[in-house]
Amino acid sequence: MPRLPVKKIRKQMKLLLLLLLLSCAAWLTYVHLGLVRQGRALRQRLGYGRDGEKLTSETDGRGVHAAPSTQRAEDSSESREEEQAPEGRDLDMLFPGGAGRLPLNFTHQTPPWREEYKGQVNLHVFEDWCGGAVGHLRRNLHFPLFPHTRTTVKKLAVSPKWKNYGLRIFGFIHPARDGDVQFSVASDDNSEFWLSLDESPAAAQLVAFVGKTGSEWTAPGEFTKFSSQVSKPRRLMASRRYYFELLHKQDDRGSDHVEVGWRAFLPGLKFEVISSAHISLYTDESALKMDHVAHVPQSPASHVGGRPPQEETSADMLRPDPRDTFFLTPRMESSSLENVLEPCAYAPTYVVKDFPIARYQGLQFVYLSFVYPNDYTRLTHMETDNKCFYRESPLYLERFGFYKYMKMDKEEGDEDEEDEVQRRAFLFLNPDDFLDDEDEGELLDSLEPTEAAPPRSGPQSPAPAAPAQPGATLAPPTPPRPRDGGTPRHSRALSWAARAARPLPLFLGRAPPPRPAVEQPPPKVYVTRVRPGQRASPRAPAPRAPWPPFPGVFLHPRPLPRVQLRAPPRPPRPHGRRTGGPQATQPRPPARAQATQGGREGQARTLGPAAPTVDSNLSSEARPVTSFLSLSQVSGPQLPGEGEEEEEGEDDGAPGDEAASEDSEEAAGPALGRWREDAIDWQRTFSVGAVDFELLRSDWNDLRCNVSGNLQLPEAEAVDVTAQYMERLNARHGGRFALLRIVNVEKRRDSARGSRFLLELELQERGGGRLRLSEYVFLRLPGARVGDADGESPEPAPAASVRPDGRPELCRPLRLAWRQDVMVHFIVPVKNQARWVAQFLADMAALHARTGDSRFSVVLVDFESEDMDVERALRAARLPRYQYLRRTGNFERSAGLQAGVDAVEDASSIVFLCDLHIHFPPNILDGIRKHCVEGRLAFAPVVMRLSCGSSPRDPHGYWEVNGFGLFGIYKSDFDRVGGMNTEEFRDQWGGEDWELLDRVLQAGLEVERLRLRNFYHHYHSKRGMWSVRSRKGSRTGAS
């Protein structure tokens, strides 16, 4: 066993210690370099004053060393790694669902930096995008690679004085000296400031922000409004540069601005805007075209890819549907479907071949198809603002809602009253409920039943006095006393207006015609009125009316008291201490009566003697008026003598009590209880039947309602047609196929000859897999016999194909079969639309990758685009086929579409006249092929036009029911109708689609009109699309 050389170790001890020290020094150097590379260098405790110089420790008068004010910040800076962790939590808020992990497309390597980059930073502008939150900016389809404008700014304070835009400002910050720095951001509306630990965009962290919802904002320079605006102190080094990114979103309100300030982490220092001396460009973009995006940095703040946020959508159309992926199921062989149904001629009566159609009147000859099952294309989430689906007036729905569809359940004891209300017209008064001129005097008599109106001596005859009771006296009427030089003093009592020679009608309008006198017993009317020297007992129950004076308005009518609409001015009262005695009472008119609203309903009380008759010569403004509501007040019957007892008991009040009562009311301010609270019946129930508003719709092309979906086909009809077809199919093949589900049924109705159906069924083959059946069938009405449209292939006699029971029977329409392998060409004219061309090509490549369908081609007609190389972008896109056509001059949509169709050589292929700003569903190719039949059908799908700030993941908008610009048709049919009108629509567009529709219908083709699921037209800005000059300083938005 070898021994340890102890003697040698002792001799070389000094050398071994030296080697150990060198090893430790090398290890510490390695660790230090590694920390520096990660931005967490070993730091010394240094303090920085207001001028940036290092502070020295000082000794106060007591000989104690005073620590610098920044030492607490230095202590906290040692745990910088732990403090930065909470800032990084916003990644999960911005990108939920595991988006916190770094996607593969983050930018880790920065482009070469040059000294001339100093003094400015990169600015990317995303115009015409609604919303005030930064999250709304991230929903933009082109964010962050394809902005509307690329430019630079010289300081981190920007105010374009515009609306509905988003900004992305990025570059490098160069600190002036080493030390701890705080950042703050201020903006209107929301903004976020991201700062990297070094120059790499991948290491950016959110350090300060203004709001998350879009409703938060600050004034310019207001750096301390929100706690989230100010960052934690961060140690920066003057020898390095730090990548930053500033995101800002502005809506259509407020004073737009965004600025970033910084300060040394010292008490009392204010934030200062970061100027050009401390910023530099990320890279120079001045020589790059808009389709060059490899240099654009992608950071955690803004990047492409990753896991998108999973938001709960409110649109039913986004929910999965078997139609979306049914095209991937293998289709049945055409040989298996031969001789299943008997052939029959197909010539619907709604085809207007060779019929003269006026300009733009082809819209009236387009009919809609019925769909089963429900495809949820109805925009239910948009009906809060647009209720046109219900075929009701918007004003009516806003005022009355949907209560007419509900029948309120009757309460016990209210059956007769409710029946009477239902028998009356809604909001119309019954003339029999009003009193004639002779009967109006009865309102002034008494509470006893009146059998006939007593004779009156004149229009101002006083009402008969009530029977005298023991202890009750009535004062005679007293005229108003003159005041201030003979000016008559008006009484504040509630009284009847003087009657003129000719009474005025209750409603100012046409008087009702006189009714012939009918020998009927006069109705007994009980009227509650203000009687002199009487008070209604507060314990007396309120009477109920046999029917409401306004039928249909109140479910439970209440008698209303008579009120004085305009009272005369109150005489001035001396200010002083109020007492309850009569000495403190000022002289007042002897007549004083007051109607109350705050007490029991239908009760009135009087204070003092009766009011005198008012002179008819007084001004109209000072004349006491009785409300019309009081004329309609009807009370129930009252027992004889009941009112007199109440009068006796309540006429004993002293004058002092009256004054005290009035003083207390005046001291309390306005009368309490003047407005009644509505009673709420929480136990009210109602009855309602099933309502299907789809029954109110027809197949007429509705151009007024743009939120309604496809017409719904009744389930019984769809099941009956499917059952007939499956019966014939199994009879032909001996029960080899079993029906799994009905995926889609479309019906075009012809009330004269029959209906056309498109059946799409999922079948299970015996001993095989699942198959897709998608065929047109015709349900011919009994006795309907027509020849073929071109006089060929006469159909057999109707008796040979009509069922014995006389019911319609299915047949196979001749020359109405669609081809599954036909080529589809997308024709798109473009000009200076780099970001939209790139998005369109990306969508087409994704469509090819998802469906595996290579039977389509993209034809781009370029009108000298200057912002990108369209041909190079086409070659770089992963498309199965493409064509590039270059034209000179201004943009002409009609000429561009015609040139694209002329470039297609195969006349038996489909051309789809398309737009650049379209989001296609995955089944778009299958939908175009199914609804285009050569010589028979053309397809004009309805696209959903997205609103500003809306995206396909959260679609808000409306169906473009008037637009026919997206049009699919066989090239042979397109050439036969004459193509596009390039002569009339040369320098303008808008109307060329309607003009083409007129000629297509005149050629005898049907135009299939359906709303496609997930088929959107992106909202986009029209600024700079066709080289239109803009006015400097204009603040009007793009249309």
Swiss-Prot record:
InterPro entries: Chond_GalNAc, CS_glycosyltransferase, Nucleotide-diphossugar_trans, PA14/GLEYA, PA14_dom. Highly expressed in ovary, adult and fetal brain. Also expressed in fetal kidney and lung. Residues 37-1039 are lumenal. Pfam families: CHGN (PF05679). Its EC number is 2.4.1.244. This is N-acetyl-beta-glucosaminyl-glycoprotein 4-beta-N-acetylgalactosaminyltransferase 1. It is found in: Golgi apparatus, Golgi stack membrane. It comes from Homo sapiens. Residues 51-63, 72-92 have a biased composition (Basic and acidic residues). Belongs to the chondroitin N-acetylgalactosaminyltransferase family. The gene is B4GALNT4. The chain crosses the membrane at residues 16-36. Coiled coil: none annotated. Its main location: Golgi. It comes from the Eukaryota. Residues 627-636 have a biased composition (Polar residues). Keywords: Glycoprotein, Golgi apparatus, Membrane, Signal-anchor, Transferase, Transmembrane, Transmembrane helix. The keyword Protein biosynthesis does not apply.
